Design a protein with these regions (language model features):
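Terminal-region recognition feature
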Residues: 1-198
């Protein structure tokens, strides 16, 4: 059963030369995560973070210098909450600082990746969106009761993530989670979702 935090994103028609639905690439110490948040994309992201982390630590030791940060550029409409949390935890475990950059749009489960960065940047014309989780579910009445309990646990976790890594007051957080409203860079800076507008 897939749990999505928000609506499942519809895929745009493929263009000539487009061989993958996920777009994750590495250039020097930069990772470009231009993808939905799903198991495959987050697995690939986690591997790329681990690879760059190992290279950065080795480089730092060989040159006896400070470890350079990994720069993670995010353009994502979100997706699967569990996959998003897995990548969030990978970022938090990294021995190398990871600077996150909102590059156009970070929504839903992708915001978990954004808000836990060591330093968080957002381009001035970008947007973020947070909202409550949603699920696709089928089962018996007892299954629904269990699902409600599971969803309550996940919502509590989502709120705790924002409480720990942003400055959004709980009353405001409860209000915005009920809606699908974009926040511009200035609003994200005001509520501590990012540290700097670039």
């Amino acid at each position: 059963m897939e749990r999505y935090w928000g609506e499942k994103q519809k895929q745009a028609p493929r263009k000539a030369g487009d061989t993958s639905e996920k777009h994750i690439s590495v250039q020097d110490n930069k990772i470009y995560f231009y993808s939905g948040v799903n198991r495959n994309a987050c697995c690939e992201l986690n591997k790329k973070i681990s690879e760059l982390e190992a290279k950065a630590v080795t480089l730092s030791q060989n040159l006896d210098t400070q470890t350079p940060p990994i720069k993670l550029f995010i353009n994502s409409g979100g997706g699967n909450i569990v996959s998003g949390i897995a990548s969030m935890d990978t970022i938090l475990r990294s021995k190398v600082p990871i600077h996150t950059y909102v590059d156009g749009f970070s929504a839903s489960a992708a915001t978990f990746l954004t808000v836990v960065g060591t330093h968080r940047y957002m381009s001035r014309n970008s947007y973020m969106l947070v909202h409550q989780l949603s699920t696709q579910f089928w089962g018996t009445y007892s299954n629904f009761e269990d699902e409600k309990q599971n969803l309550d646990l996940m919502m509590k976790n989502i709120k705790n993530i924002y409480k720990e890594y942003t400055k959004i007051p709980m009353k405001k957080l409860n209000e915005i989670l009920k809606h699908d409203l974009l926040w511009d860079a200035k609003t994200c800076l005001e509520y501590g979702m990012v540290d700097e507008i670039i």
